[in-house]
């Protein structure tokens, strides 16, 4: 076997072209309507590759001078991987004990056991505990001779000459005595109590599951004595409390590995204590509510919608500082009834004038309608009420309304209107008049009188003065300098000081 070795060949096998037909075809010399078959490059390359791979599998190098290499390759492959008739399966023996056992089991020939028939070794021993050896007829005879010298099984003890002595020799006398009053295993009725004086337990076992009741008590001085209940196997067993009335059964409580479910109302006279950070939970509808204590604060928490048994969401409606007891709210508070507080403070903020519109402050949530009155703060008295509030888009101030009033209106008010004017429905009575005295005229008078003369026909009193009288020597011709007038200044009193007024 050899490959193409002239210059017409290539060194790399060309890719095999796609299959043209699924029909098996054969060579033809062109007889009849058939053309002469042309195998083509693919067919020769495939045949050469198959032959060369066969030699490679057998470990034989192609030799152009030898014409039996294909036969030698097939023979070598068979010798390496096949059992030869002439060797009588010696190849398996040579492979070792494990290979021999595997070969037997492949033929369904096993070593004999209690559960499977198969090959077994014989023994004549009568004292062997082995369960893999088979007894010979000799061993069986020895055992039968021994048995014949003993009590016959088919006599069921009838051949025992002294049965009471036999029971006594077996130490069964006390057992027989107890059996007379024993509880039957298939059911019985007790007229008295059942007492366990040791660590015995009461157990129910079904399949691989069990339920047990026991009592732990190491000594009379044991301070950790308790009665225990246990179910077990794969963790799916649990305790169930239920009640039955007539034909109706009602589940009351389930206790599983990780949770106690109370299915009816629970009335607790003592404390309900949770040592988990998350305590009481109410899971109803889409949302869950629970109380959480993280060590520093105690929170009222909510879950996301649709996850009422899940963890808490980002809302913090209310929390209590564990150290100070201070209550904080993170989502606002709506109160329909009265609210009582010793002190009330606003977390105020600073800013520019225009920002006062949005600062934290006490404010009415609803805008005051035009021409409608709204009180923001109110103080109740025995016969009247005082309010801070206003009239929509018109006024804001302090108002008083008597309890006896039936018609709309107020009984007293002092307010600022929408133009910035401050109006008071009655007198403004200051507690200190100093501010008023320094600004307003308290009194007006005529000042000290003086005489001025030399009147002319166009005389005018000095600025801020008035004429109070005339003086003449007899004739009043208002010339010559002998006619005169008396004048006094007009004065005003401001804050205790007299000032002369000026003319316009």
Curated annotation (Swiss-Prot):
Component of the tail fiber that acts as a receptor binding protein. Binds to the primary receptor, thereby determining the host range. Two alternate tail fiber S and S' proteins are encoded extending the host range of the virus. Disruption phenotype: Viral particles lack tail fibers in inversion-defective gin mutants (blocked in G+ orientation; no switch to S'-U'). GO terms for cellular component: host cell cytoplasm; virus tail, fiber. The orientation of the G segment is defined as G+ and G-. G+ orientation provides S-U fibers whereas G- provides S'-U' fibers. S-U and S'-U' dont have the same host range (e.g. respectively E.coli and C.freundii). It comes from Escherichia phage Mu (Bacteriophage Mu). It is found in: Virion; Host cytoplasm. InterPro entries: Gp34_trimer (IPR048390), Phage_lambda_Stf-r2 (IPR005068), Phage_Tail_Fiber_Structural (IPR051934). The gene is S. Keywords: Host cytoplasm, Host-virus interaction, Late protein, Viral attachment to host adhesion receptor, Viral attachment to host cell, Viral receptor tropism switching, Viral tail fiber protein, Viral tail protein, Virion, Virus entry into host cell. The keyword Endoplasmic reticulum does not apply. This is Tail fiber protein S.
